[in-house]
């Protein structure tokens, strides 16, 4: 065997160096929110396509720091409440600023305006600054959990609540 068989030639070395940043970019992100693919990414809890940037939410947590996407803050609240690691301080909870539809806010620091026409009908829109018509995260979370899943998120045959309200929609 010749002594050159174990050496990398110049062309192979350059190709390897060029591929390294590309391969590094393929590594999954483990913190912070990620861009949504509007009109393509599905909501984890209801399966509907996320299309309204003013109400989207993301949760990152668990042992693998997996990112999960939602079309409404209410779906994210319900989903997280069912996770065994829900109280882990490392869990990240992001919500889109409803005023801009382009800026992610830390959901626990955001303020929520009630009465919004949100995709799953939980009725909360996140905003950056407090106002006389907003509530904090804990208040919004409590109201969403007490209300339960909206009828839009329940499997067929499990619709509950006022049938007149459903007929109007």
Question: Where in this protein do the model-derived segments appear?
Answer:
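N-terminal secretory signal peptides
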Residues: 1-22
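Residues immediately within or flanking Cys/His clusters that coordinate Zn2+
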Residues: 40
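Short cysteine-rich clusters marking metal-coordination/redox-active sites
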Residues: 43
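Cys/His-coordinated zinc-binding microdomains
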Residues: 47
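Short, non-ligating residues that shape and space the ligands of small metal-coordination modules
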Residues: 52-53
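Mature extracytoplasmic domains of secretory-pathway proteins
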Residues: 68-113
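Beta-strand-rich cores of mature extracytoplasmic or soluble domains
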Residues: 97-169
């Amino acid at each position: 065997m010749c002594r050159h068989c174990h050496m990398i030639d110049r062309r192979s070395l350059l190709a390897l160096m060029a591929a390294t940043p590309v391969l590094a970019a393929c590594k999954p992100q483990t913190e912070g929110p990620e861009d949504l693919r509007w009109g393509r990414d599905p909501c984890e809890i209801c399966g509907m396509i996320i299309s309204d940037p003013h109400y989207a939410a993301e949760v990152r947590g668990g042992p693998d720091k997996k990112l999960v996407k939602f079309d409404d803050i209410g779906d994210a609240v319900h989903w997280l409440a069912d996770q065994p690691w829900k109280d882990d301080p490392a869990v990240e909870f992001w919500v889109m600023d409803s005023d801009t539809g382009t800026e992610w806010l830390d959901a626990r620091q955001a303020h929520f305006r009630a009465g919004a026409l949100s995709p799953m009908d939980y009725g909360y829109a996140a905003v950056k600054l407090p106002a006389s018509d907003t509530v904090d995260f804990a208040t919004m979370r409590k109201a969403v959990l007490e209300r339960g899943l909206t009828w839009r998120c329940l499997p067929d045959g499990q619709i509950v609540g006022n049938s007149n309200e459903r007929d109007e929609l």
